[in-house]
């Protein structure tokens, strides 16, 4: 049974309130490193202490390894040690993920986000071998990303217990939402547990979660930090108020998808990070107007 030491150590490496940061592009579709620096500095200035780069919202499927590393190095230079930088290195190819992990470690990542292999649907033993190979490749702490809605398979509870025994696996980003199973796993494994689904941010804190890896945090970084702080200080009334006020952003994310929501929200706030790469579409004018109204309701515009 864990004493909670792992969770404490995990938070030291992965922070408490973060976002899966967008990858900015120019009008021609090339990566925009200057805009990447700008948005990273903005988010950290507004209270976030961790940034996931090249995750789902960072359009990892449609960015190259070179682009991922260029952005990581630039953001590291921009924010210094003011925030933890977590590099998304998960793919459905173990060899590729190992190579990305090694490169991210050399580029200065504080942690690695490793998603469940998607499309190929490996067995649980395959997951153990996959995550184990990545964990053995570097000494950089790992946050597992459990998101069966995208990957097609979950990390089952027994698999999670076995993975928690590996010394560099310290955290989980949960976008599965099995609250009953996770309540036991948080206690048993001591892994730092992060909300990977904004509708459940406050719920995860109540169950012993360590923080958030958010999408709506692009639009509301200060409010998200205040939500976390209010809960930690025992002001549950205020935490509930903030959570409720942010609900229009959660609804907008459900309509638009995370990438489109995050990029459009930043643009409406005066930070241009370009459009998503295909096949993800930018919001049309009607969708953009609805988002503008949702942001006003949430008090972020």
UniProtKB/Swiss-Prot annotation:
Binding sites annotated in the UniProt record for pyruvate: 57, 213
Pfam families given in the database record: DHDPS (PF00701)
GO MF annotation: an example: 4-hydroxy-tetrahydrodipicolinate synthase activity
Main EC class the enzyme belongs to: lyase
Site feature location: Part of a proton relay during catalysis: 56, 119
Reaction(s) the record says it catalyses: L-aspartate 4-semialdehyde + pyruvate = (2S,4S)-4-hydroxy-2,3,4,5-tetrahydrodipicolinate + H2O + H(+)
UniProt KW Nucleotide-binding keyword: no
InterPro entries linked to this entry: Aldolase_TIM (IPR013785), DapA (IPR005263), DapA-like (IPR002220), Schiff_base-form_aldolases_AS (IPR020625), Schiff_base-form_aldolases_CS (IPR020624)
Subcellular location: Cytoplasm
Pathway: Amino-acid biosynthesis; L-lysine biosynthesis via DAP pathway; (S)-tetrahydrodipicolinate from L-aspartate: step 3/4
Recorded family membership: Belongs to the DapA family.
Assembly mode: Homotetramer; dimer of dimers.
NCBIfam families listed in its UniProt record: dapA
Name this protein carries in UniProt: 4-hydroxy-tetrahydrodipicolinate synthase
């Amino acid at each position: 049974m864990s004493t909670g030491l792992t969770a404490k150590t995990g938070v030291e490496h992965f922070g408490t309130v973060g976002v899966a940061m967008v990858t900015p592009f120019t009008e021609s579709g090339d990566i925009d490193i200057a805009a990447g620096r700008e948005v990273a500095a903005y988010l950290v200035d507004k209270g976030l202490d961790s940034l996931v780069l090249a995750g789902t919202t960072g359009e990892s499927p449609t960015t190259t390894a070179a682009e991922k590393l260029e952005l990581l190095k630039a953001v590291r230079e921009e924010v210094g040690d003011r925030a933890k930088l977590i590099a998304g290195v998960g793919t459905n190819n173990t060899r590729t993920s190992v190579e990305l992990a090694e490169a991210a470690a050399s580029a200065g990542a504080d942690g690695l986000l490793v998603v469940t292999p998607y499309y190929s649907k490996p067995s649980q033993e395959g997951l153990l071998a996959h995550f184990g190979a990545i964990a053995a490749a570097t000494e950089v702490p790992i946050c597992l990303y459990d998101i069966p809605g995208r990957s097609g398979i979950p990390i089952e509870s027994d698999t999670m217990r076995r993975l928690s025994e590996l010394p560099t696996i310290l955290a989980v980003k949960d976008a599965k939402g099995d609250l009953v199973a996770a309540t036991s796993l948080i206690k048993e494994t001591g892994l730092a547990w992060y909300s990977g689904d904004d509708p459940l941010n406050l719920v995860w804190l109540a169950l012993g979660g360590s923080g958030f890896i958010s999408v709506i945090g692009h639009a509301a970084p200060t409010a998200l930090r205040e939500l976390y702080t209010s809960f930690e200080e025992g002001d549950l009334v205020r935490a509930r108020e903030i959570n409720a006020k942010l609900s229009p952003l959660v609804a907008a994310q459900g309509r638009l998808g995370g990438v489109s929501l995050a990029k459009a929200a930043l643009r409406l706030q005066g930070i241009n990070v370009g459009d998503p790469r295909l096949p993800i579409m930018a919001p049309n004018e009607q969708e953009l107007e609805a988002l503008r109204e949702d942001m006003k309701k949430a008090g972020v515009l």
